[in-house]
């Protein structure tokens, strides 16, 4: 089965690569919503990534990337799951744009945004996973926060240097930030502080891949390594195009795998580990953001 380029939307942030500090970074995002075969309308106030949402932001000192997966179960009670995930994006953008007033961190950004979203009364109900990375262009440190079963990888020298672990309450029920209807009782009280925070010292040519579970449920880490391994990032004039193509290729492969009913997908393996029978891929919204680090020697 062939999947054409039109099935995918790519948001490449062409202006990310600026040698203001010791490090620069290039970023690109690719996504496809489930049961969709055409690009979303340009008139939307945000990209139509289904229940997923994402962020690519920068200022003079930091680069912020994040992915969110709105929990689809809310659709069963007539609530659009994307309203919550994109609501978080909206509030995080506000907080990040005012981050000169405080020392930013993924935990601070998400905590302030989540609190603001709850106070805004713009979301009746909903929930979402969250995975944020904040890259410091001055010292090369990547601060992260992952809550739920979205996540990120750090690829270095052709190997997985780090893979964030998933946080789940039970099978197919990830940790999630939520707003519940007033008449709804929830036993869970999950907040941003329950996410796993890490710090990593990044190096030249490190590749950071953030993705929702639509990616990780349908493509093995080794396959991601294989796809990334054939990309040549040595020429600065061609880096952005290569990164755009990489994000799209991984997204495309995950979507193709999700439609294969015969293979043992990562999701199928996880299901079996919990005692459930499942075969094939898992059709879902797929969102991936790639961040490539480049350093400059000022000696």
Curated annotation (Swiss-Prot):
SMART domains reported in the protein's UniProt record: PP2C_SIG, PP2Cc
GO-annotated molecular function: protein serine/threonine phosphatase activity
An example GO biological process term is: positive regulation of ubiquinone biosynthetic process
Question: From which domain of life does this come?
Answer: Eukaryota
Q: Name one GO cellular component term.
A: mitochondrion
Instruction: Give residue ranges for domain PPM-type phosphatase.
Output: 35-293
What does this protein's UniProt record list under function? Confers azacytidine resistance in high copy.
Q: What is the protein's name according to its record? A: 5-azacytidine resistance protein azr1
Q: Which organism is it from?
A: Schizosaccharomyces pombe (strain 972 / ATCC 24843) (Fission yeast)
